[in-house]
Amino acid sequence: MSNLTCKALAAAAVSLLEERPLDKITVRDITDRCGLTRNTFYYHFQDIYDLLGYI
């Protein structure tokens, strides 16, 4: 697991969580925020809840 990629995804998720509730955040929102693809997200995490566990 690339530490920089995971940190970028985590930072994007935290940033979005400051703006809106979790149920209004999609994987695409997270990947768009940090400039990565959905495939990259799913390479590192199973779903948003897996990412939250990382955070």
Regions found by a protein language model. Name each.
Residues 3-14, 18, 23-27, 35, ...:
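An amphipathic alpha-helix adjacent to DNA-recognition modules
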